[in-house]
Amino acid sequence: VMVSGILMPLSSNKLLILNPFCAPEDIDLEMMRYRPNSWMMIPMFVAFLVRNGRITDDYDMSYLLAAGVGCEACNNKEMKNYQKFLKDHNCNARFTTGYGCSEAGSNMTLPMMPYAMENGSVGVPLPVDIISIFKAGTHEELGYNQMGEICKYGQGNMLGYDDPESTAKALQMHEDGRVWLHTGDMGYMTEDGVLHVLTRGKSPRHGGGDLATLLMENIVADADIEGIKDEFFVIIPDEKYPGRFLPYLYVILEDGYTVEDIADQVYECLDPYMHPVDIFELPERPFFHFKTNRIGLK
């Protein structure tokens, strides 16, 4: 997000505003101060806009013509909530998501207007980039709509890490003679070339089934369970079965609701292998180092 946010305006004759001294929790005040036309954000920034309560209902955000996020995935409920927030404040920008990483030289995809921004959709590969899906841990290329590891070939890829072992794991020469970047992210690509990013790494559960955080979050989001404002999964190693994992669900509830009120509907909408071991309530989504603090909850 940072690299794109700097390169895009510099390469297109736009005014670039850099503010390294803004406290993240005051991002709403800075937005109202500078009134940006284009803003490449992270989900944490939008969450602060929504929940800080300092942007009044009648505040006009029509100056914002382009808005989107990177850094981490947004589930369907987050996407709907953020799009509604923009619309309620007279902003007609389409809220979008992108995908990239430092190792790939920043952005790897570009949102496309004809396609809905849901279910982990991050758009199509940027020009000159080649993105393909491979069976995790192999060089076997998969077909459309098959979930596997997202890999990228292109001139923007890094030269390597300081650690040769990590470099060899990330940059692999395939049988086609190309050096592919293995991102470690799992997803799939549709026949139209639209990439969907679903989770980080493979997380098989004992008894069968691979746990994908965004896929499970979207199922709960699409169930539209009354009382749930926001939710996210945390996947942790299964101490009883090495190499296997367990899911836990964290929810932010509307006033007056308890976990007991929503638990049955959560279990009903999910496949059995996706059932959370437990459901915990939080007052709000926690962030650390600009991302949802899943590590701190493990």
Residue ranges and their predicted role:
Residues 11-14, 36-40, 50-118, 130:
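Gly/Ser/Thr-rich phosphate-binding loop
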Residues 132-151, 188-192, 259:
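Conserved beta-loop-beta connector loops within the AMP-binding
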Residues 17-19, 96, 279-283:
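General small-molecule cofactor/ligand-binding pocket signal
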Residues 1-38, 52:
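Conserved AMP-binding/adenylation subdomain of ANL enzymes
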Residues 268-292:
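AMP-binding/adenylate-forming catalytic domain of the ANL superfamily
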Residues 39, 154, 159, 169, ...:
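AMP-binding/adenylate-forming catalytic core of the ANL superfamily
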Residues 45-46, 74, 157:
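Alpha-helix capping/helix-boundary segments
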Residues 120-125, 177-178:
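Short Gly/Pro-enriched turn/cap motifs at secondary-structure boundaries
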